[in-house]
Amino acid sequence: MSWFLVLKCLLTVCIISHLSVSSTESYGCIRKTCFGGRCLHNTTRSCEFSKGCFSQLQEFAVPLLLLNRRVEQRGCSEDNCTELAFSATLGIDWMFSYNHQCCYSEQCNNKPINVSPLSLQPNGVECPTCYSELGTCRPVSLKCTGAQTTCVNVTGQGIREDFIKIHAMGCATQTACNLKNVIILNNIKIDTSCVSGSPPLRYSPSLSTDQKTSSATAPTLCLLAAVLPAIMVMESFSEL
């Protein structure tokens, strides 16, 4: 075989290999962001060398305040996609659920996504619970329910608003343990650690009445501050 034919064969193999790699690593992912049922956009984005498509749903609720919000996102994963689903009950009555799913084919993230419903059935575990942006908080005992069988400690900080500094405790699923730099609500980066069983309460120094009020209302204020940029974007989009 002549050198010309050898080089031609090698070139053909290289081209086929390149096309094969491109076809497996480049595909379209649905791109959508929704807050409270209002969606900013719903398009297909080609994700070259994508690490996968993702679908994410976050839901937080404060039943005492009749507050319930859902944040849904879909798009291309910037890094290797890792699936994660967890739920937690923190503070007085603040419930949070998170579900992040991955897939690896054309528009595969167009399927409906949900979070597991929270059970009200006590499971025998009791955890210290509190929520504060003041650095310390006075925990009270919380009877855990359903799959939330571990006691979690959460620290967090705002990404765009660095004045948001969270310390919280409560009940959580096992999957909420030992999280590092997980971003929730697009604006808060959290770390978590867990303690199994029902640990004893360890009270911080007594808080003033104003501090207790701030601690009780902090979940709502902080979350509203976190999602406010998204609301403003939605409003601007609706006016176009």
From Swiss-Prot:
Q: Which InterPro entries match?
A: CNF-like_PLA2_Inhibitor (IPR050918), Snake_toxin-like_sf (IPR045860)
How is expression of this protein distributed across tissues? Answer: Expressed abundantly in bone, including the lengthening growth plate where cartilage is remodeled into bone.
Output the GO biological process annotations, alphabetical, semicolon-separated.
bone remodeling
- Where does this polypeptide localize? Secreted
- Originating species: Rattus norvegicus (Rat)
Question: Per its UniProt record, what CDD domains does this chain match?
Answer: TFP_LU_ECD_PINLYP_rpt2
* Swiss-Prot/TrEMBL induction comment: Up-regulated by estradiol.
From which residue to which does the signal peptide run? 1-26
Q: Which family does it belong to?
A: Belongs to the CNF-like-inhibitor family.
- What the entry says about post-translational processing? N-glycosylated.
Top-level taxonomy: Eukaryota, Metazoa, Chordata, Craniata, Vertebrata
Q: Which residues are glycosylated?
A: N42, N153
Offer a single GO CC term for the protein. extracellular region
What's the stated role of this polypeptide? May play a novel role in the growth or remodeling of bone.
Protein name stated in the entry? Protein RoBo-1
